[in-house]
Amino acid sequence: MALRLEDKKAIVAEVNEAAKGALSAVAADSRGVTVGAMTGLRKKAREAGVYVRVVRNTLARRAVEGTAFECLAETFTGPTLIAFSLEHPGAAARLLKDFAKEQANFEVKGAAFEGNFIPAAEIDRLAKLPTYEEALAQLMMTMKEASAGKFVRTLAALRDQKQEAA
């Protein structure tokens, strides 16, 4: 079904707004995936703070023009699903990577983060980024381990002092 010019402009504006507020983007080919599976993906995406849209390639190219995700334009061939992470940079990559494991026909084409293109083979780099809470927990564990090590060294020095005095 042909889209009217006003509809096309609205789609480009909507996707462009999502791109401007996004932290990262992932492009994928959803050909052969059932409607039920796509509905489940969209539900998970909403819960994870990811904007997902199936867009015509020409409209997708125009929507990302002038944004940090312009490097994705070369991946817009065939049926294109584009996902923008709005809350966490790795959310869309993690979501689509997990979905690709479940669906044999689903293929991730590539991702973009801070203006850099990430090929599909290296999508794990983006998907494995820790969330804010995970990063805080890692920092706290590092600080805790450092203070424990300092405490152990202090006790060892105190023991050495007492042995020398005795």
Curated annotation (Swiss-Prot):
A Pfam short name: Ribosomal_L10
CC terms in the record's Gene Ontology section: large ribosomal subunit
Gene Ontology BP terms: translation
Subunit structure, interactors included: Part of the ribosomal stalk of the 50S ribosomal subunit. The N-terminus interacts with L11 and the large rRNA to form the base of the stalk. The C-terminus forms an elongated spine to which L12 dimers bind in a sequential fashion forming a multimeric L10(L12)X complex.
Functional note: Forms part of the ribosomal stalk, playing a central role in the interaction of the ribosome with GTP-bound translation factors.
HAMAP family: Ribosomal_uL10
Name this polypeptide is given: Large ribosomal subunit protein uL10
Organism: Shewanella sp. (strain W3-18-1)
